[in-house]
Amino acid sequence: MLKRGDKLTAALNTGDPKQLSDMGLRYDLTLPLSRYYAANKDKLPSPFKVIQTDRVFRAERPQKGRLREFVQCDIDILGDASPNAEVELIDVTTRALLNIGFTGFTVNINDRRILRGMLESMGFAADTLDSVCITFDKMDKIGAEGVKAELTEKQLPESAIHALADFIAAGDVTLDAVAARCADPAIADDLKYVLATANTLAAGRYQVAYCPSLVRGQGYYTGMVFEVTCPQFSGAVAGGGRYDNMVGKFLGVQAVSYTHLRA
């Protein structure tokens, strides 16, 4: 809780950031887990698999779909660089959803590295890719023309914008077409493996689909990402992805996480 008034002024004058607040509210379960793993790795099994459920808080202005407090459920695997980690987490997530009564849902899957490689090949500079991805992620909401307009407003290269628009206008954006622009074929192979295996495990109970525009808003995701959408709900009911860099800040270990199922 941030101090106010004279107490805040006095705290600022100390030059010590720790004096600015009396306590904090937990934002998520992911960062604390990363710290715990880094401090206790030698005592833990490998890979390390965790399930957590607890309250978390956001500095949000309350509105539909935006809450200041909610219950977050995390399922994490740390220390597994293989795509089998993604397969397992998607399988556990979907079985949990089926067990609590969800039906007719779709698991949408993408890999940020493939998307970034495609965009860079079209002429977008590396330092603008995060911004481009955020706009591209809105494809299902604002459409191709909306994406083109927003990228133009950001004053990005006109030739790159036209290249992306032409690619979208060509029809269904397939994984093979996107992968052809990716510098590392192994990344596309891993994504194909996850899609095929997840579809086999679905056994017709739900759909599994490649979603080329899926990015997910959290900046810490580094590779494969996925979201579960359901016709009865306007937003995703579950989602997650690989976040190697976050754990790497504490210890050079790769990790994948299903980050939230809100209840």
What does each model-found stretch correspond to?
Residues 1-5:
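Short, structured active-site "lid" loops
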Residues 8:
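Anionic ligand-binding catalytic core segments
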Residues 11, 15-20, 28-44, 49-103, ...:
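Positively charged, Gly/Ser-enriched RNA/tRNA-binding surfaces
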Residues 67-73, 109-117:
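Short, conserved phosphate-binding/catalytic loop or strand-edge motifs used
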Residues 94-98, 113-121:
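Hydrophobic mid-domain F-helix/FG-region of cytochrome P450s
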Residues 105-107:
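A short amphipathic beta-strand at an alpha->beta junction
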Residues 116-126, 219-226:
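Short glycine/threonine-rich loop-to-helix capping motif typified by GTGT followed
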Residues 124-143:
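Acidic, His- and aromatic-enriched active-site or binding-groove loops in soluble protein domains
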